[in-house]
Amino acid sequence: MTSRRWFHPNITGVEAENLLLTRGVDGSFLARPSKSNPGDFTLSVRRTGAVTHIKIQNTGDYYDLYGGEKFATLAELVQYYMEHHGQLKEKNGDVIELKYPLNCADPTSERWFHGHLSGREAEKLLTEKGKHGSFLVRESQSHPGDFVLSVRTGDDKGESNDGKSKVTHVMIHCQDLKYDVGGGEKFDSLTDLVEHYKKNPMVETLGTVLQLKQPLNTTRINAAEIESRVRELSKLAETTDKVKQGFWEEFETLQQQECKLLYSRKEGQRQENKNKNRYKNILPFDHTRVVLHDGDPNEPVSDYINANIIMPEFETKCNNSKPKKSYIATQGCLQNTVNDFWRMVFQENSRVIVMTTKEVERGKSKCVKYWPDEYSLKEYGVMRVRNVKESAAHDYTLRELKLSKVGQGNTERTVWQYHFRTWPDHGVPSDPGGVLDFLEEVHHKQESISDAGPVVVHCSAGIGRTGTFIVIDILIDIIREKGVDCDIDVPKTIQMVRSQRSGMVQTEAQYRFIYMAVQHYIETLQRRIEEEQKSKRKGHEYTNIKYSLSDQTSGDQSPLPPCTPTPTCPEMREDSARVYENVGLMQQQKSFR
């Protein structure tokens, strides 16, 4: 269980239904405190456009669903039913599936809020990336609904004067929508609390001053709240250097991680392959390059093309989900690589090609024409391509091509080329809507072909626009699968793609455009969901559960005691003994500045 952000501490059943219907998809779920039985909980699950509510009892000894399996923690119960599909059923036998956690909204859009992060993970982050005075705020895993301020207190060499841990954790209590650190002033928001203690540092009982000098920012974001993150990233810096603000800072941090991705590119550097590279230093990584298998055995380099396979690597809880969409990122064809391009398309069974450049831009060749004229047929080495039809849309041209191998009869495959024509020669499009409509069409076409191989994406070098299109598409696929309330991480996604082809997403403008495109997609999706929900009925009342387990012995049905222990996430058990600073005993000290 990597997160328990599915726990919503302050919502009613009606609010849960509204959240699941407007933000979730079928299979989305959340847990919340029971309003009818204080101390108990309720599991709310979206199924076929409606919401089912399931009661969870806490006897003081264990958690269960009024019968069936028993668990030590709420997190273990949820994890069990997520991983064991078919175990949770209604009386009529219908299966209730927990697929996608619907995350609780972040309490702040500030980038120092990291959401779900364990104490150890916070210490690792602050130790590796922070310095003296670096801080972050995270959710408390041992006390759902509360938060923790983690501060690096050691010097920049990683050691504090008295040998204590170089990271201090301070519990932030949240009650009645007010925040405090266990005594003293209460604040209306986490931001107000942090700003106060930045100006008025806390002092530990042993005298260590907790100075909040610089935030350690996160790049993770709840997709539904991307507008707030974009607003934060768009703020000008507080210094006189007005250029170095959020987007620049995030992109520059990403650029500094390039040294971690220096994989070998020996095949592209071979003398025999140099004329197959459009740009002599933009070469494919060896470990992900597309290797052509049907070349001339007398020509040892006939297996080379400047192209890499891109495999998205994001979690999925759905054990029976279909394989994820993959991509081939490649350069624009040269005159001497067109034959190899079609060999690759045929070998990989690619059915969709995305071209994001014009043939010539600013007087320079970006990609030679690798397809025949409309209604024409042309042979490219051992491959034969027939252009059946071309149709023009607002921003792109769609070409229906028939691909076959010479000498293999009339067996043809349909390949669809989507040629995006309106990317400006300089910068990025001013409106992401055209790109999103284009990618939506590409997505539907790829989904409609059951055995389709990777989507081939190219521009000129095969890294800038190509990387931008692929990253946007990957992020949108995550949102499609998990709903608008899932977590996304733009820099992490780019880093993942860059680990498979170097230099993907080239400029800060392209980086910013990715955020703008995802924001536009979310806003459009939310409007559509809201319109759909206006005509739908509300969710069901509580359902009776039937278990498919062989052991269906009922648990103790005694009334719940008025006070029940706070559930603890299983991965935090070893951390439960960690001593939080008793900030009620801390003294406030005026700023040293």
Curated annotation (Swiss-Prot):
UniProt feature, compositional bias: Polar residues: 548-557
Binding residue positions for substrate: D425, C459, S460, A461, G462, I463, G464, R465, Q506
Protein name: Tyrosine-protein phosphatase non-receptor type 11
EC number: 3.1.3.48
Membrane-traversing stretches: none
GO biological process, one term: ERBB signaling pathway
InterPro entries in the record: Prot-tyrosine_phosphatase-like, PTP_cat, SH2, SH2_dom_sf, Tyr_Pase_AS, Tyr_Pase_cat, Tyr_Pase_dom, Tyr_Pase_non-rcpt_typ-6/11
Reaction equation(s) it catalyzes: O-phospho-L-tyrosyl-[protein] + H2O = L-tyrosyl-[protein] + phosphate
Main location: cytoplasm
GO molecular function, one term: receptor tyrosine kinase binding
Keyword Phosphoprotein: yes
